[in-house]
Amino acid sequence: MGDNDRTAIRRKALRRGLVSEYVAAVFLMLKGYRILALRHRTRLGEIDIVARKGDLAVFVEVKARHGEAAAVDAVSAAAQKRIRAASDLWLARQADQARLSQRYDIVAVTPSRLPRHFPDAF
């Protein structure tokens, strides 16, 4: 496999990830969440979606897989640790941090189905 093939595969995966994150964000908005950030990057890691519902800050990992179980299983302990660290930085910058509770969710995006939201997944 040449460099061009690998680059094309990476580009396709990135595009699929971006589309999946957008689909997940729209899905969460329809459920009453306010989207505050997409692909929020910090020096400690990235959060796919930062959302809020009232005084609840929700940090969402989006996984596109062929099955829901595979999507949930794809969020490793290391990824969870990075997301938690990044969320701590995000929370520290919020003026109303003291009154916010937090939750870590997963949204599984699978072909030909509605996304599935797993609240409090980790």
Curated annotation (Swiss-Prot):
Transmembrane segments: none
Gene3D superfamilies given in the database record: 3.40.1350.10
Pfam families to which the protein is assigned, alphabetical: UPF0102
Lineage: superkingdom: Bacteria
InterPro entries registered for this protein in UniProt: Restrct_endonuc-II-like, tRNA_endonuc-like_dom_sf, UPF0102_YraN-like
Disulfide bond residue pairs: none
Any one Gene Ontology molecular-function term assigned to this protein's record: nucleic acid binding
Similarity remark: Belongs to the UPF0102 family.
Protein name: UPF0102 protein RHECIAT_CH0000358
Organism: Rhizobium etli (strain CIAT 652)
Lineage, broadest ranks: Bacteria, Pseudomonadati, Pseudomonadota, Alphaproteobacteria, Hyphomicrobiales
